[in-house]
Amino acid sequence: MTEAWRPDGDEPRGVSGPFRVRVPAKINLHLGVGPLRPDGYHELNTVYHAISIHDELTARRGDTLALTMEGEGAGELALDDSNLVIRAARALAAHAGVPPYARLHLRKQIPLAGGLAGGSADAAAALVACDALWGTGLSRDELAGIAADLGSDVPFLIHGGTALGTGRGEAVSPVLARPTVWHWVVAVADGGLSTPVAYRELDRLRDAGAASTPLGSSDALLAALRQRDPRVLAGVLGNDLQDAALALRPSLAATLKAGEAAGALAGIVSGSGPTCVFLAANAADAERVAGELSALDVCRQARTARGPVAGARVG
């Protein structure tokens, strides 16, 4: 039985643990970027899709709030209050009126600054793990409400699956479609790209008349998902930030060309990049495309993934 932390900070009784939470990476099947808003964000119309590349966060009892980390790019991340994991834990504690005491350990597989929402995923994992550890008993929607203040992608990664994102991306509604498994190849580049820098570059390209026509509505993408045909879906994948990512990292054009030459149905830059994702017709084709990309000097690594998968979950 789990008992919540008491607001007076006394030692709780009956809290079990550790709690391990797996959280997926995110790709955008459609990323329509509108004009810059007065608050400094862009209005988005995006379709999020959770894929089977996961980080894992373990939460244990502690007498302070501490974070350790291993895996993909772990040495490049701060472990203090600037880290989204720590910020998420503190936000949940403040919301629930409990002291933020936990020992958190993060195993990373999602590349840093790769357009896969790795930091947002870890924040979602922290909310779910600490909710379990502290017995705060919040619903998914309540956790997503806290998540919205941490980052635009964080609410989606609480839920997972496939979802429509509007506003700055934080307003999430699930996409209702018959269950389908989509097969992806994820080509990870060396280094990362800053999301704010990518948005500023898109604004610059648009001001100069050098950007593609904005994608706008995601209706065609949502209709393609309902058809459950990868070839139809391939024809409507799109990302307004791709122009910016290619301008900032021209080598990504060779990655996209190589993936499609290897047999992918379509390839796009994931989010703000520099990761590229390719849709394959089936699992065997995905393995073959990943193998061919791995043999070329166009990405740091290529791995297969499937989607959609669940969001942050204990287990």
UniProtKB/Swiss-Prot annotation:
Catalytic residues in the record: K26, D153
EC number assigned by the record: 2.7.1.148
Pathway: Isoprenoid biosynthesis; isopentenyl diphosphate biosynthesis via DXP pathway; isopentenyl diphosphate from 1-deoxy-D-xylulose 5-phosphate: step 3/6
InterPro entries: GHMP_kinase_C_dom, GHMP_kinase_C_sf, GHMP_kinase_N_dom, IspE, Ribosomal_Su5_D2-typ_SF, Ribsml_uS5_D2-typ_fold_subgr
Sorted UniProt keywords: ATP-binding, Isoprene biosynthesis, Kinase, Nucleotide-binding, Transferase
GO biological process, one term: isopentenyl diphosphate biosynthetic process, methylerythritol 4-phosphate pathway
Binding site for ATP: P111, L112, A113, G114, G115, L116, A117, G118, G119, S120, A121
Catalytic activity: 4-CDP-2-C-methyl-D-erythritol + ATP = 4-CDP-2-C-methyl-D-erythritol 2-phosphate + ADP + H(+)
GO molecular function, one term: 4-(cytidine 5'-diphospho)-2-C-methyl-D-erythritol kinase activity
Protein family per UniProt: Belongs to the GHMP kinase family. IspE subfamily.
Function: Catalyzes the phosphorylation of the position 2 hydroxy group of 4-diphosphocytidyl-2C-methyl-D-erythritol.
NCBIfam families on file: ispE (TIGR00154), PRK03188.1 (NF002870)
Protein name as it appears in the record: 4-diphosphocytidyl-2-C-methyl-D-erythritol kinase
